[in-house]
A protein has these predicted regions:
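Short, amphipathic alpha-helical "recognition" segments used to contact nucleic acids or chromatin
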Residues: 2-18, 68, 72-80
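Mobile genetic element proteins and their domesticated derivatives, centered on retroelements
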Residues: 9, 34-37, 45, 71, ...
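Short alpha-helical "recognition helix" segments of helix-turn-helix
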Residues: 21-27, 90
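Residues in the recognition helix of alpha-helical DNA-binding motifs
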Residues: 36-40, 108-116, 282
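Basic, flexible linker segments flanking DNA-binding modules
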Residues: 48-142, 222-228, 299-305
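Mobile-element integrase/transposase regions
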Residues: 107, 111-170, 178-200, 229-233
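Acidic/histidine-rich, metal-coordinating catalytic segments
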Residues: 194-219, 242-244, 299-301
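Charged alpha-helix within mobile-element recombinases
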Residues: 220, 227-296, 300-305
Length: 305
């Protein structure tokens, strides 16, 4: 079963209302085959689209007990560490540990986790196929930036600023500040550029630390801020998401979810200095160790280089 093709079929028919006969021609399948894919998707959700290993043709109850236990342990270790712990991620880790012929399929791993009570099926959950994704074609084509809030042990609100490469998902810079300012953005941008070269463009929201283009009401005659002037001097194109459309910066929004899940699994930082040490550890693990599903399960470091 071709997972990417089946995702495209579901997106085309369920979410874009493509006629069945047109889908049959486009994807090279009979209408009966397409109906079967859609029917299974509606009954079982996105997991029904996962590939089934042709090598083993085995079910979850036919897998060796030691492999089942390793799957459960990996799930617990990844969850405790604050990392993604789905069937795809576990499958990637198993491929590093075992001979490929001994690794269960993603769908079998999912069923093992379900049977052990580690996950609950969500057939009505919106599938990832329903999101239209954009990705830069090469590293340093586009960088994304945003900041998010985090609380340290004394209840002080801290802001974490990040720059990521859109193509490779590589974290270029992540640092905590008491307040994110235009100076903060310039400092982190230049530090990223010093280590990785300059990007062709950047993509951010419309926060005033990034742009003044929407400030000043209807007149909008505001002068560009110092960060915008820097970009202009360097010949770097600034792109910004539409107001009330946060999905434009979807990659960095999902990154924030990963970051916060990981931070919650760590000892609570007492100071901003301790938080920045944690962020350095996170950056290393995220870039060099964690497989990224959107990168065909390689790390951002491998994708960048």
């Amino acid at each position: 079963m071709n997972y990417s093709r089946n995702r495209a079929i579901v997106f085309a028919i369920v979410h874009s209302n493509m006629p069945l006969n047109k889908a049959s021609i486009k994807f090279g399948l009979s209408t009966r085959q397409i109906r079967r894919i859609i029917s299974k998707y509606k009954k079982e959700g996105a997991e029904s689209l996962l590939p089934v290993s042709r090598a083993s043709k085995t079910h979850a109850n036919a897998i060796q007990e030691d492999i089942i236990q390793r799957i459960i342990i990996l799930r617990e270790q990844l969850t405790t560490g604050g990392w993604d712990a789905g069937a795809k991620t576990i499958h990637t880790y198993l491929l590093k540990e075992l001979e490929p012929s001994k690794v269960p399929s993603i769908s079998t791993i999912w069923r093992i986790l379900q049977r052990s009570g580690k996950i609950i099926p969500e057939p009505k959950k919106r599938p990832k196929t329903s999101y239209i994704r954009f990705q830069a074609d090469y590293p340093n084509e586009t960088w994304q930036s945003d900041f998010t809030h985090w609380t340290i042990s004394n209840s002080e609100d801290i802001e974490i600023t990040t720059w990521i490469d859109d193509n490779s998902r590589y974290i270029l810079n992540v640092k905590a500040y008491k307040t994110t300012t235009v100076h903060t953005i310039i400092e982190t941008f230049l530090d990223s550029a010093y280590k990785n070269g300059l990007p062709t463009s950047i993509l951010t929201d419309n926060g005033l630390v990034y742009t003044t283009r929407l400030s000043g009401g209807k007149k909008r005659n505001n002068q560009p801020n110092s960060f915008e002037q820097l970009l202009d001097n360097l010949g770097i194109k600034a792109k910004h998401g539409r107001p009330a459309h946060p999905t434009t910066q979807g990659k960095i929004e999902r990154y924030h979810q990963t970051l916060k899940r990981w931070l919650k699994a760590q000892p609570v930082a007492k100071t901003i200095e301790e938080l920045n040490l944690l962020l350095q550890d996170f950056q290393t693990l995220y870039n060099q160790t964690r497989p990224h599903q959107s990168l065909n399960n390689i790390t951002p470091t491998r994708s960048l280089h």
